[in-house]
């Protein structure tokens, strides 16, 4: 017993929670002898387009007997008066039934499937008897809120008699209006009696803003007593029959409203029926339901009262009955014209689920994926910003063939991905003013319109991608390189540079894709991707983006503007460098370069070297004094001094010649290496190991330069760089090597040292002589 009850509950709840994707009119009414057309909707799939469609009548036992199907079956009772037509291009099928009788009243199902237990929708059909009217009764049929004009004829004898219109209420006939200017209070400001032109046998009564209670039998009368002329008029006031709208979840719907010229100057609205009331979701006076914020637009079509309401990003709760109308208050009022719709939201949507909210931070970027119908890959794509004015508007910011709107240059681009069923919109350099709602649109299938809310918060840290400085200047004809730093989390992603223009951001080739003017290289060990312009041209000026992506999925980006200027006359030509790379690598390179310059200055200004030079000069002066005294004393002393001087100058001249040759060779080698240098190679050639091991390798023969302090500073810098490297990279071995500049310094230091030694010998020689 418990098991059976559990199975029953499961069946009941599963039936409640599962909504059939078939949709049609719930209630259909007509009168005997007339015809009806019943339209049923089904999901747009290949299987549904080709499967069996049927129309069956439910019996008391729950069995549904087929009356007509798309397989060609037609029951006897429908023979000659019914048809079923499938419209696969619209995903609908229509059942037409003619010559209705009261016996056709009942419950029916329209559905899909090989049996009548497949997918279906319940329809109730009611056929009424033809109403009986008195002889010569004219029938007027009007919708609620409209105006009816009742025509009343009379004979010439009653041309000057009293005219009136009354409404039958049981056996009595209550006057609505007469020619004495009497008007029933319930018809005040709505009923008018008049005659047209020179007509002497017809008068007219207009009743405007019709309401359901106005329906009934009316009597026109001209004259009094037995000679009076009377006409009967039956007025039927109908509720507007709702138009069916079948839409997929996450798609869009448009309500086209045409209320007529009589309300062209009144405020318009769209409301959703809720039991006895109709709640306004938008009107032309600025009222808007918060549940539709960012996804609704009201657009006037012309001056005749036509307007449309577009809703995107449909949700399950959007299904229901809607009405559009007009009134000076912008709210529904009885007796004013309305149009009605019934919206069905199919949860088995072909539109993929996408993010409805995207978050970003100031200075950062967002990449928004917009789906579109894959069958329309050649359609034009757009992206617009929803603005909350009175009716709502969405001006286009960018499109596949549209220029980027002013104010978004350099920071907005649309990347079309044909065949993928989606395109990507990237917006960078975010500000809090960018927060709001955005729409993805195409000029194809109007159902594929999606809404995204962008939320931009204040940044609390630096962006993941960073290029500094934000304003860079390149010189025409020179080589320009700029670096983009990225964190370790982007290590496995593809890094790229692209040049922004009004028609997108075109990705630049990397070095291994061939030599071109603009190229990109990536240094994984230092997490830098660099862009090089070689040589710089005037057309290279503009915005450049550095970004990351995985396949066709775009990630973060950052932007920089590169200005291009002519080389000033007399300015030096610096080939391998650029201001941006120098600024970015300043903490590392400036410390290295300043240390090298400090080492060179200390070597040149060493006081010991100046002391040695002074000793050579003093030794020469002392030798002259000794030679002068020798000349005064004896000729033998003069001859001995000349021999000593000759033996000293010859080796000194040879040493000077050897030193000059060594310096020249070192300078030539240094010049060749400089020609191959760039900023990055300079950082590689002069490694930390060179400064640590230079003393052991003879690079610091001048001990007065006190290199210990310099080595301490450089070692500390090297340790900082090691800790900031990505842990995924193996540590590079540091090999000590001697640069060409150090070799030149070594040769020059050796020359000075040997010169000081010879000078000391010259100083000692004459004394011993």
UniProtKB/Swiss-Prot annotation:
Classification via SMART domains: IG (SM00409), IGv (SM00406)
Transmembrane annotation, as ranges: 644-666
Region (Disordered): 569-604, 619-640, 719-741
Residues exposed to the Cytoplasmic side: 667-769
Cystine crosslinks: 40-110, 152-220, 257-324, 370-440, 484-546
Residue(s) carrying Phosphoserine: 678, 687, 694, 740
Domain Ig-like V-type residues, every copy: 21-126, 135-237, 240-341, 353-457, 463-563
First and last residue of the signal peptide: 1-18
One GO CC term, this protein: secretory IgA immunoglobulin complex
Bias-annotated ranges (Basic and acidic residues): 595-604, 731-741
Post-translational modification: N-glycosylated. N-glycosylation is required for anchoring IgA molecules to mucus, but is not necessary for Ig binding.
Free-text comment on this protein's domains from its UniProt entry: The Ig-like V-type 1/D1 domain contains three complementarity determining region-like loops CDR1-3, which mediate interaction with IgA and IgM.
Protein name: Polymeric immunoglobulin receptor
Organism: Rattus norvegicus (Rat)
Gene field: Pigr
């Amino acid at each position: 017993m418990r098991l059976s009850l559990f199975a029953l509950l499961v069946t009941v709840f599963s039936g409640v929670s599962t909504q059939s994707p078939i949709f049609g009119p719930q209630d259909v009414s007509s009168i005997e002898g007339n015809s009806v057309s019943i339209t049923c909707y089904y999901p747009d799939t290949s299987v549904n387009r080709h499967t069996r469609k049927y129309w069956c009548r439910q019996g008391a036992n729950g069995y549904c007997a087929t009356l007509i199907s798309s397989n060609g079956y037609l029951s006897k009772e429908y023979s000659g008066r019914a048809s079923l037509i499938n419209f696969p291009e619209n995903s609908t099928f229509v059942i037409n039934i003619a010559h209705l009788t009261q016996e056709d009243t009942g419950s029916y199902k329209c559905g899909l499937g090989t049996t009548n237990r497949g997918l279906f929708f319940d329809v109730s059909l009611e056929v009424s008897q033809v109403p009986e009217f008195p002889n010569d009764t004219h029938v007027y049929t009007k919708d609620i809120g409209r105006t009816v004009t009742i025509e009343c004829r009379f004979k010439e004898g009653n041309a000057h008699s009293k005219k009136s219109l009354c409404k039958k209420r049981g056996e009595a006939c209550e006057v609505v209006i007469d020619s004495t200017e009497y008007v029933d209070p319930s018809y005040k400001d709505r009923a008018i009696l008049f005659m047209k032109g020179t007509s002497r046998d017809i008068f007219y009564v207009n009743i405007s803003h019709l309401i359901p209670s106005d329906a009934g039998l009316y009597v026109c009368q001209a004259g009094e007593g037995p000679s009076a002329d009377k006409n009967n008029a039956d007025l039927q006031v109908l509720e507007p029959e709702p138009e069916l709208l079948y839409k997929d979840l996450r798609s869009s719907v448009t309500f086209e409203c045409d209320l007529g010229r009589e309300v062209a100057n009144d405020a318009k609205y769209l409301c959703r029926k809720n039991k006895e009331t109709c709640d306004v979701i938008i009107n032309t006076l600025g009222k808007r339901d918060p549940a539709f914020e960012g996804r609704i637009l009201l657009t006037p079509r012309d001056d005749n009262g036509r307007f449309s309401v577009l809703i995107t990003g449909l949700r399950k709760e959007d299904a229901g009955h809607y009405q559009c109308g007009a009134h000076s208050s912008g709210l529904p009022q009885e007796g004013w014209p309305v149009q009605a719709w019934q919206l069905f939201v199919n949860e088995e949507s072909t539109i993929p689920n996408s993010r409805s909210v995207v978050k970003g931070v100031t200075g950062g970027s967002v990449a928004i994926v917009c789906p579109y119908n894959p069958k329309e890959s050649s359609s034009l794509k757009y992206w617009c910003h929803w603005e909350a004015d009175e009716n709502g508007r969405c001006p286009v910011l960018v499109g596949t063939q549209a220029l980027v709107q002013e104010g978004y240059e350099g920071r907005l681009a649309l990347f079309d991905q044909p065949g993928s069923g989606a395109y990507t919109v990237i917006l960078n350099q975010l500000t809090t003013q960018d927060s709001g709602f955005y729409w993805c649109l195409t000029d194809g299938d109007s159902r594929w319109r999606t809404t995204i809310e962008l939320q931009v918060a204040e940044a609390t840290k630096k962006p993941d991608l960073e290029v500094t400085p934000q304003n860079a200047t390149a010189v025409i004809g020179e080589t320009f390189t700029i670096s983009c730093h990225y964190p370790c989390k982007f290590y496995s992603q593809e890094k790229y540079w692209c040049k922004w223009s009004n028609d997108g951001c075109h990705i630049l080739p990397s070095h291994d894709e061939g030599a071109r003017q603009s190229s990109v290289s990536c240094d994984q060990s230092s997490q830098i991707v660099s862009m090089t312009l070689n040589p710089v041209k005037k057309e290279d000026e503009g915005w450049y983006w550095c970004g990351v992506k995985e396949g066709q999925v775009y990630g973060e980006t950052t932007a920089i503007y590169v200005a291009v200027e002519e080389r000033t006359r007399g300015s030096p030509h610096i080939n391998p460098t650029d201001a941006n790379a120098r600024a970015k690598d300043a903490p590392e390179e400036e410390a290295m370069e300043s240390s090298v310059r400090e080492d060179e200055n200390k070597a040149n200004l060493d006081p010991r070297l100046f002391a040695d030079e002074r000793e050579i000069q003093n030794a020469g002066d002392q030798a002259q004094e000794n030679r002068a005294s020798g000349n005064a004393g004896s000729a033998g002393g003069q001859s001995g001094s000349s021999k000593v001087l000759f033996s000293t100058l010859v080796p000194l001249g040879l040493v000077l010649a050897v030193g000059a040759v060594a310096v020249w060779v070192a300078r030539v080698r240094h010049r060749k290496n400089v020609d191959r240098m760039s900023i990055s190679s300079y950082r590689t050639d002069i490694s930390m190991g060179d400064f640590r091991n230079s003393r052991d390798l003879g690079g610091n023969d001048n001990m007065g330069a006190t290199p210990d302090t310099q080595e301490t500073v450089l070692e500390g810098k090297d340790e900082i760089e090691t800790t900031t490297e990505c842990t995924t990279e193996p540590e590079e071995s540091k090999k000590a090597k001697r640069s060409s500049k150090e070799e030149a310094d070594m040769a020059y230091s050796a020359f000075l040292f040997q010169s000081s030694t010879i000078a000391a010998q010259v100083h000692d020689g004459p004394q011993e002589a």
